[in-house]
């Protein structure tokens, strides 16, 4: 049996302390990804309306016979316009498309106009 002599070894008196500076609520996530988060503002009616108008202008530049869609979109409240955009997203999902096209927007407006609350 062997005994180990510890007389000559010196242990540090003070333990090493790690100091972590206090970070704010969302800085931990930022430091983990290395990017700053950009907080999105609440979307307004104008954002939905301009986006759908741009899509419809790409598909139908002259709007011959399609101007009722813009009138219908302009007459909607914010929550109704959000409903139409969600319905257009559902239609694009069912058709296995990643982007919302004018066909989905027209279909969503037709579905919404067929209901009595429109």
UniProtKB/Swiss-Prot annotation:
Gene3D superfamilies per the UniProt record, alphabetical: Histone, subunit A
GO annotations of cellular component type: nucleosome; nucleus
InterPro entries: Histone-fold, Histone_H2B
GO MF assignments: DNA binding; protein heterodimerization activity; structural constituent of chromatin
Subcellular location: Nucleus; Chromosome
Keywords of the record: Chromosome, Nucleus
Transmembrane segments: none
Tissue-by-tissue expression: Expressed in germline. Predominantly expressed in oocytes.
Any coiled-coil regions, as ranges: none
Function, as annotated: Core component of nucleosome. Nucleosomes wrap and compact DNA into chromatin, limiting DNA accessibility to the cellular machineries which require DNA as a template. Histones thereby play a central role in transcription regulation, DNA repair, DNA replication and chromosomal stability. DNA accessibility is regulated via a complex set of post-translational modifications of histones, also called histone code, and nucleosome remodeling.
Record-stated family: Belongs to the histone H2B family.
Oligomer and partners: The nucleosome is a histone octamer containing two molecules each of H2A, H2B, H3 and H4 assembled in one H3-H4 heterotetramer and two H2A-H2B heterodimers. The octamer wraps approximately 147 bp of DNA.
Protein name: Histone H2B.N
């Amino acid at each position: 049996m062997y005994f180990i002599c510890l007389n000559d070894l010196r242990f540090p008196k003070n333990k090493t302390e790690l100091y972590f500076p206090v970070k704010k609520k969302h800085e931990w996530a930022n430091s983990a990804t290395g990017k700053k988060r950009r907080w999105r503002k609440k979307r307004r009616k104008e954002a939905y309306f301009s986006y759908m108008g741009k899509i419809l202008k790409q598909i139908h530049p002259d709007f011959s016979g399609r101007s009722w869609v813009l009138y219908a979109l302009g007459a909607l409240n914010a929550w109704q316009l959000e409903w139409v955009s969600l319905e257009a997203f559902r239609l694009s999902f069912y058709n296995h498309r990643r982007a919302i096209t004018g066909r989905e927007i027209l279909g969503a407006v037709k579905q919404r106009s067929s209901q009595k609350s429109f």
